[in-house]
Amino acid sequence: MQVVQKRWLLANFTSGLMAGAYWGIDSAPVHYQLDGGPTYPGYTPALARDLIATIRTNYDVFSDAEAAVLENHGYLLAEAATRTHLAAERHEAPLQIPHPGWMSEPKIREALGDSSRQVFLGRGALHALLRPGPSIVPD
């Protein structure tokens, strides 16, 4: 989202002209905690900023780890933002993290270490064919 559009949206939320919540990929649920309010589960600000926000967005396929972490992050941010800013409008439903096996920061840091790196011809089927390793052609 462009800076001016984000500023306009947040100004409308603050003035009461609009109701809503905003969250960005480089944010973390801890940023939505109010003094004395509930704590929200989620990834750390450092993990969100340093790895999740840097996952390439060049129409390349995501690895299973990238897809799982991005989905978890979206769910967790939406939960925190809407509980903080839209509590009256929410329909209560228990939070179910889509991929609970992908909540460990060390595991994520290892799996997403090169996720910001763009690969010539991508990581899709053509990349798999050109990659050295076991043949994908059946005997």
Regions from the PLM with identified roles:
Residues 1-139:
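Catalytic domains of lipid- and phosphate-ester/thioester hydrolases
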